[in-house]
């Protein structure tokens, strides 16, 4: 029913930037950001999860998977109703139970793009982004917590998908244009 590509990488690795560019170049793909879904729900008037999501994001913690999967699936259904079935899901799964839960209850991902980037580069990008993003989690304290969470919880997902030969690794240390060029080349066999 759905064709899903997970898009993984640490905070500030460039996942959102690259997904936006890919969705623009290949109009058959829709970019769904797990973080954006959570922030939208957090700010939606009357949301029963808003305050909970806000606390998790502020503390750099991973929001319970049932909430995130439900929000992602709702977005996917909305797109599917418009005839779109190819998705770049950015920033998800963040831990193994999310990966297993999504693949069991929604659909298996075809593969994952992993934007590999060092913490020093990601930190510089996030500090720069924090000046204009208005995101509550683009501050040094939250960023450091997000790095710890990412390393402990998300790297096992990367290793798991790699062990299943469902991982394409992209060097995200480069400038965004070079990263995009490498990503498009890596995706060619799947388009």
UniProtKB/Swiss-Prot annotation:
Residues 128-138 are annotated as: LID. One of its GO terms (molecular function) is UMP kinase activity. Its cofactor is Mg(2+). Residues 33-63 are annotated as: NMP. The keyword ATP-binding applies. PROSITE patterns: ADENYLATE_KINASE. Its EC number is 2.7.4.14. It is found in: Cytoplasm; Nucleus. SUPFAM superfamilies: P-loop containing nucleoside triphosphate hydrolases. InterPro entries: Adenylat/UMP-CMP_kin (IPR000850), Adenylat_kinase_CS (IPR033690), P-loop_NTPase (IPR027417), UMP_CMP_kinase (IPR006266). Disulfide bonds: none annotated. ATP binds at residues 12-17, 129, 174. Its main location: cytoplasm. Keywords: ATP-binding, Cytoplasm, Kinase, Nucleotide-binding, Nucleus, Pyrimidine biosynthesis, Transferase. It comes from the Eukaryota. It catalyses: UMP + ATP = UDP + ADP. Pfam families: ADK. Binds 1 Mg(2+) ion per monomer. One of its GO terms (biological process) is CDP biosynthetic process. A ribonucleoside 5'-phosphate binds at residues 39, 61-63, 91-94, 98, 135, 146. HAMAP family: Adenylate_kinase_Adk (MF_00235), Adenylate_kinase_UMP_CMP_kin (MF_03172). Monomer. Consists of three domains, a large central CORE domain and two small peripheral domains, NMPbind and LID, which undergo movements during catalysis. The LID domain closes over the site of phosphoryl transfer upon ATP binding. Assembling and dissambling the active center during each catalytic cycle provides an effective means to prevent ATP hydrolysis. Belongs to the adenylate kinase family. UMP-CMP kinase subfamily. This is Uridylate kinase.
């Amino acid at each position: 029913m759905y064709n899903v590509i997970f898009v993984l990488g640490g905070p500030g690795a460039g996942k959102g930037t690259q997904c936006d560019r890919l969705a623009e170049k290949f109009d058959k793909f829709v970019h769904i950001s797990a973080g954006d879904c959570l922030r939208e729900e957090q700010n939606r008037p009357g949301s029963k999860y808003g305050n909970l999501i806000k606390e998790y994001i502020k503390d750099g913690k991973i929001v319970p998977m049932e909430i995130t999967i439900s929000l992602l699936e709702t977005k996917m259904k909305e797109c599917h109703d418009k005839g779109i079935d190819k998705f770049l899901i950015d920033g998800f799964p963040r831990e193994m139970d999310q990966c297993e839960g999504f693949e069991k209850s929604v659909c298996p991902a075809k593969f994952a793009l992993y934007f590999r980037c060092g913490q020093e580069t990601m930190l510089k990008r996030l500090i720069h982004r924090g000046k204009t993003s208005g995101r509550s989690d683009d501050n040094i304290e939250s960023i450091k917590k997000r790095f710890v969470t990412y390393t402990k919880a998300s790297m096992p997902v990367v290793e798991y998908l790699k062990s299943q030969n469902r991982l394409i690794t992209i060097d995200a240390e480069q400038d965004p244009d070079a990263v995009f060029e490498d990503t498009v080349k890596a995706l060619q066999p799947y388009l």
